[in-house]
Amino acid sequence: MGRGADMTPPLRWRLGVAGGVALVVLLVDQLTKLAVRAVGDALHVTVIPGVIDFLFVRNIGAAFSMGEGHGIAFAVLALAVIIAIAVYLVRAPQLAHLEVVGMAMVAGGAVGNAIDRLTMGFVTDFIAATFIDFPVFNVADIGITVGVVLALIGYMFLSPAAREVDATAELNARDEARAKRKAKQRGERARKIRERNER
C-alpha cells in the first residue's frame, strides 16, 4: 500500500466510466451470445488447438456452469449485486480508478448473464478451455472474474482509503517503536541509579 498515486475520482467520472465500461462488457457479451445461438448446437470450432474451443452450452446454473437448477435465484442475486455496486460507487467517499473499472466490469457481466436467465431461462456459454478440466464460460464470466481482480487490486494497492490505513499503521508502528526506545532508556537510567546507590 502507499505505492502509486490514484486520487479519488469525482462522482461524474465514476458514473460515466462505470456506465461506459459496463455497457461495453454487456454489448460484447450479448453480441457473442447472439452469434453463438444463431449457429446453435452445430457450433464446435477449435480456436487454438489444445487450448480454446467454441461450443454452445445451455447453462441453467451460475457462472462457469456451476449451481445448475437455481437460475432464478442466481438472477435475483445478480440484480442485488448490481444494486450494491451502484450504491457503493455513488456513496463511497474514497475510491481508486481501478476499483471503478473493476466493479463496472462485474456489473456488466452480471447484467449480461441476468438477461439470459430472465429471458431464456439459461445462460449461453461457449468458451471451452480444453487444456484443463474447467467449465465452459462466456464473456460475462470473464468480465466478472477480471473485474473482481481489478477491483481488489485497486482497493488494496491504489485506493486513498487503503493508503490512509497504511499510513495510520505506519504511524502506529513508529509510535510503538518510539515508546519501546523510551522504555528501554528509562530502564537503563534506573539501572545506573541503582548501581550508583549500591556503591
Question: What are the language-model segments listed below?
Answer:
Residues M1-R199:
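Alpha-helical transmembrane bundles and membrane-interface segments of multipass inner-membrane proteins
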